[in-house]
C-alpha cells in the first residue's frame, strides 16, 4: 500500500537475474558433501546491502534435548538437517554485511562460516556483542547453505534456532570450557562497568555486563540491583517487555523501591498498558510523594487515556514531534468507531460501530513497527530486500522493516499471535510459539505478512500535500507517491481494498489516521485503495497491479472498466492528450476547443449512472476551472469546478451557477472520491462565490476544510495552508 516496489525497474531486474542465476547454481549442488578448504573471504566492498529471501523453510519447533547431534563433515549442501543439532564455538571476530558473520568450529575442529540474519543494526547492537571468539551455541536443525558467491555457510534465518550458552553450562564440551571461565570480578564491579557503558550509551554492552552481574550476584540484593540496572537498559533498547520482567525481579514485594516502581510504570506505558501504568504511578507517589518525575508521567498518561477515550488529539504537537528523525509520535490509539468482524469472502475486516459522517475520525493508530527511510533517495548504501521466490524487490524502509519486526517479536512473544493473525495468504505458520525457553519467530512468515500488510508512508501527509501544491499551482494533480518509509499498523491492515473506498489513510510520523470520506452507516465495512486508480488503465492492467495481494477487485470502477472496450480507452486517451496540450498553453482561442474536447471526452462514458467515477475527466475540469477563475469568467469557472467534482462522484446542489433553487444554495448531498485536488476545488469554488454569491463562501470554505481533513488527517493546519497559498 503505497510501498515503493522496484521490481520492474531495469537496474533491479538485472541485479535480481544475476542473483537468481547464482542461487540456481547453488541449488544444483544440493546434497553434495563439504570439500576441504572451500571457504573464501568476502569482499569488503558493499555499496548495495542486499538481503535475499530464499525459499521458505519453517523454524525448528523441537527442543534441543530431542535432537540428534551432527557434525559439519556429515552435512550436505542446500539441506536443512531436520531432527539434528550441532554445537559450535566462535573462532574469529565478527564481520557484518547483510548478516552478522564469523568463522565457527564444531567439536571435531572443522570450521565453517556462520551467518546470522535479521540481527539488530550495528548502531543498536554492534556485531561484537552478537558474535565474539569463544562464544558457544547449539544450532538447531542447521541449514548448510551454498552462498551466491560459491562459499559455504551455516545460514540462520530464524533467531530462535540458535541457543547461546554461558560458561557454566554443562553441555559445553570440556575442551572448550577453560576459555569460558571468568575470574576475579564480583557483581558490584561488573555493575560499575555496566554504568560506564550506560554513560557512553553503549546499550548492548551494558546489557551484557548487567546480565553477567546478575549471574555473579552472591545474594538477592546484588541480583535485584543488577536486574534494576538491566531494566533501564532494556527500555533504552526498545524492549519494554524485558524491561518489565527485569523490574519485577528487582522488586522487593514487602518494600518496593522508588526506582523499581518507576521502571515498571515506564515499561507498562511503552507496552500500551496505560491504566496499569497509572496505577503503578499512584503507588509510587503514595510511597514517595517527592518524586517529580512521577507527577509529570501521570500528566502524560492522562493525556493518553483521554486520546484513547475521546479521539481528541493535539495535532500541532504531533507535527512538532514529527520533525525529529525518526518521526515517532507519543500518542495512543483511538478506534471506538470501528470493530473487527468477518466479511464474507474477504476474511477479517473493519466495520463501523456507529453511523459516521464524511471527515469523521474512524481510527488513529500507533504503528506496530515503523522504519523511517529518510527523505533522501540516495543510491549509495541502498538497502534492498529481494524475494527470490516472488521476484519482488523493495528498498529502504520496507527492507529494514523485516528485521525490526523479527526483533520485536523475539523480545516480546506475546505480540506474535496478533501479528501472525494478519493476512498471510497460503503460508503455513508454526503452531508452537516457544521452545527451549526461546520464542519461535518465523522470518518467512514475518516477510510474507509485512509484504501483504505494510504501508508506505510520508513523514507527514500534510508535507506530501504541500509538495503537490508547490509543484502544481492549479491544484489539479494527485501524484500517487510511493514511499520508502514503511510500517505495519495492525488494525488498519484489516481494511480491505476498493479502488473507490469510503475512507482514506493519512500519516503524521508513525501515527496512521483514517477518516471517513463519505457518510457511512453503522455496521458497514470500510474500504480504502491499496493502489490508487490509474487513468486510462484497462481492467486487466488494474487486476495485474493488484496481483501481489492475491485478489480480484470487483468494485464499481473495475466492473465498468471491464465493460469498456479497448477502442473506447484509446479514444479517451487521444482526446485527453489533445485536451492536455490546450490546457498547458491556455489562451482565448483555445477555450472553445477545450470545451468541445471535454464534451467529446464526456461522451465516452455511460450517462445512466451518476455514481460512476469518470477517472480521466476530473483533472481537466479542475484545471480549466482554475484558468477561467484567473480570467474572471466566474459562472463558467464554477460550472467546470462542479463538473470536476461530479466526475469524482460528488453529488452537489449549487446555485449559482445552476438555476435549480429559489435562492443561493450550496450543499454536498453525497461525498465522492477524496483526493489531493478536492480541497483546492472547493477553495476555488469559494473564490468564485466571493464575487458571484458571497453568502455561499463560508459553505464552500467549510467543504474545503472537511476535504482537507480527509486528505491530511486533521483540520488544525488548514488556515496556515490557506494563508501560505494565497
From Swiss-Prot:
Domain SET: 336-531
A single BP term in Gene Ontology: methylation
Xref: PROSITE patterns: SET, TPR, TPR_REGION
TPR repeats: 187-220, 224-257, 258-291
Entry EC no(s): 2.1.1.-
Pfam families: SET, TPR_6
Pathway connected to this protein: Mycotoxin biosynthesis
Molecular function GO labels: methyltransferase activity
Keywords from the named record: Methyltransferase, Repeat, S-adenosyl-L-methionine, TPR repeat, Transferase, Virulence
Keyword Secreted assigned: no
Top class in the EC scheme: transferase
SMART domains hit by this protein: SET
Residue numbers binding S-adenosyl-L-methionine: 530
Entry similarity comment: Belongs to the class V-like SAM-binding methyltransferase superfamily.
Task performed by this protein: Methyltransferase; part of the gene cluster that mediates the biosynthesis of gramillins A and B, bicyclic lipopeptides that induce cell death in maize leaves but not in wheat leaves. The nonribosomal peptide synthetase GRA1 incorporates respectively a glutamic adic (Glu), a leucine (Leu), a serine (Ser), a hydroxyglutamine (HOGln), a 2-amino decanoic acid, and 2 cysteins (CysB and CysA). The biosynthesis of 2-amino decanoic acid incorporated in gramillins could be initiated by a fatty acid synthase composed of the alpha and beta subunits FGSG_00036 and FGSG_11656.
Protein name per the record: Methyltransferase FGSG_00040
Native organism: Gibberella zeae (strain ATCC MYA-4620 / CBS 123657 / FGSC 9075 / NRRL 31084 / PH-1) (Wheat head blight fungus)
Amino acid at each position: 500500500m503505497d510501498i515503493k516496489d522496484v521490481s520492474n525497474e531495469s537496474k533491479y531486474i538485472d541485479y535480481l537475474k544475476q542473483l537468481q542465476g547464482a542461487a540456481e547454481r547453488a541449488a544444483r549442488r544440493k546434497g553434495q558433501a563439504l570439500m576441504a578448504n572451500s571457504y573464501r573471504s568476502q569482499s569488503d566492498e558493499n555499496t548495495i546491502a542486499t538481503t535475499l529471501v530464499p525459499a521458505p523453510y519453517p523454524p525448528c519447533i523441537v527442543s534441543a534435548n530431542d535432537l540428534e547431534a551432527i557434525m559439519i563433515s556429515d552435512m550436505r549442501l542446500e539441506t536443512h538437517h531436520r531432527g539434528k543439532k550441532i554445537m559450535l564455538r566462535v573462532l574469529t571476530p565478527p564481520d557484518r554485511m547483510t548478516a552478522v558473520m564469523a568463522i565457527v568450529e564444531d567439536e571435531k575442529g572443522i570450521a565453517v562460516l556462520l551467518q546470522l540474519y535479521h540481527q539488530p543494526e550495528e548502531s543498536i547492537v554492534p556485531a561484537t556483542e552478537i558474535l565474539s571468539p569463544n562464544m558457544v551455541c547449539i544450532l538447531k536443525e542447521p541449514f548448510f547453505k551454498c552462498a551466491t558467491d560459491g562459499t559455504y555457510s551455516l545460514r540462520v534465518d530464524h533467531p530462535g534456532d540458535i541457543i547461546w550458552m554461558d560458561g557454566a553450562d554443562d553441555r559445553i564440551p570440556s575442551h572448550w570450557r577453560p576459555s569460558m571461565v571468568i575470574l576475579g570480578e564480583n557483581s558490584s564491579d561488573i555493575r560499575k562497568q555496566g554504568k560506564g557503558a550506560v554513560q557512553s550509551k553503549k546499550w548492548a554492552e551494558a546489557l551484557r555486563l548487567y546480565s553477567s552481574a546478575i549471574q555473579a550476584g552472591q545474594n538477592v540484593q546484588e541480583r535485584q540491583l543488577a536486574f534494576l540496572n538491566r531494566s533501564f537498559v532494556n527500555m533504552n533498547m526498545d524492549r519494554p517487555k524485558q524491561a518489565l520482567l527485569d523490574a519485577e525481579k528487582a522488586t522487593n514485594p514487602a518494600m518496593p523501591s522508588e526506582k523499581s516502581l518507576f521502571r515498571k510504570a515506564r515499561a507498562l506505558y511503552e507496552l500500551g498498558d496505560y491504566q496499569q501504568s497509572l496505577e503503578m504511578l499512584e503507588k509510587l507517589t503514595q510511597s514517595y510523594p517527592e518524586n517529580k518525575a512521577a507527577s509529570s508521567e501521570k500528566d502524560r498518561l492522562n493525556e493518553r487515556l483521554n486520546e484513547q477515550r475521546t479521539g481528541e488529539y493535539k495535532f500541532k504537537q504531533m507535527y512538532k514531534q514529527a520533525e525529529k528523525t525518526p518521526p515517532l509520535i507519543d500518542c495512543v490509539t483511538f478506534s471506538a468507531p470501528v470493530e473487527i468482524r468477518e466479511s464474507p469472502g474477504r476474511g477479517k475486516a473493519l466495520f463501523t460501530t456507529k453511523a459516521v459522517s464524511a471527515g469523521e475520525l474512524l481510527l488513529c493508530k500507533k504503528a506496530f513497527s515503523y522504519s523511517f527511510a529518510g527523505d533522501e533517495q540516495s543510491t549509495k548504501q541502498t538497502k534492498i530486500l529481494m524475494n527470490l521466490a516472488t521476484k519482488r524487490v523493495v528498498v529502504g524502509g520496507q527492507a529494514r522493516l523485516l528485521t525490526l519486526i523479527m526483533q520485536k517479536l523475539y523480545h516480546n512473544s506475546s505480540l506474535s499471535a496478533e501479528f501472525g493473525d494478519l493476512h498471510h495468504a497460503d503460508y503455513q505458520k508454526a503452531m508452537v510459539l516457544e521452545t527451549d525457553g526461546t520464542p519461535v519467530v518465523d522470518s518467512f512468515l514475518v516477510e510474507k505478512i509485512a509484504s501483504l500488510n505494510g504501508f508506505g508512508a510520508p513523514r507527514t501527509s500534510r508535507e506530501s500535500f504541500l509538495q503537490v501544491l508547490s509543484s502544481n499551482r492549479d491544484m489539479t494533480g494527485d501524484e500517487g507517491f510511493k514511499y520508502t518509509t514503511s510500517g505495519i499498523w495492525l488494525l488498519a491492515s484489516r481494511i480491505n481494498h476498493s479502488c473507490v473506498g469510503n475512507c482514506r489513510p493519512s500519516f503524521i510520523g508513525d501515527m496512521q489516521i483514517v477518516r471517513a470520506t463519505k457518510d457511512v452507516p453503522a455496521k458497514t465495512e470500510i474500504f480504502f485503495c491499496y493502489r490508487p486508480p490509474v487513468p486510462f488503465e484497462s481492467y486487466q492492467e488494474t487486476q495485474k497491479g493488484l496481483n501481489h495481494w492475491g485478489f480480484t477487485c470487483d468494485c464499481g470502477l473495475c466492473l465498468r472498466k471491464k465493460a469498456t472496450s479497448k477502442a473506447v480507452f484509446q479514444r479517451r486517451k487521444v482526446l485527453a492528450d489533445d485536451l492536455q496540450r490546450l490546457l498547458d498553453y491556455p489562451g482565448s482561442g483555445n477555450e472553445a476547443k477545450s470545451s468541445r474536447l471535454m464534451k467529446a471526452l464526456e461522451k465516452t462514458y455511460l450517462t445512466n449512472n451518476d455514481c460512476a467515477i469518470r477517472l480521466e475527466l476530473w483533472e481537466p475540469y479542475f484545471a480549466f476551472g482554475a484558468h477561467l477563475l484567473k480570467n474572471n469568467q466566474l459562472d463558467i469557472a464554477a460550472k467546470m469546478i462542479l463538473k470536476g467534482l461530479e466526475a469524482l462522484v460528488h453529488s452537489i446542489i449549487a446555485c449559482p451557477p445552476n438555476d435549480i433553487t429559489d435562492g443561493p444554495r450550496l450543499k454536498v448531498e453525497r461525498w465522492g472520491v477524496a483526493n489531493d485536488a478536492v480541497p483546492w476545488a472547493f477553495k476555488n469554488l469559494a473564490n468564485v462565490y466571493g464575487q458571484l454569491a458571497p453568502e455561499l463562501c463560508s459553505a464552500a470554505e467549510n467543504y474545503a476544510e472537511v476535504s482537507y481533513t480527509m486528505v491530511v488527517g486533521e483540520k488544525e493546519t488548514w488556515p496556515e495552508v490557506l494563508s501560505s497559498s494565497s
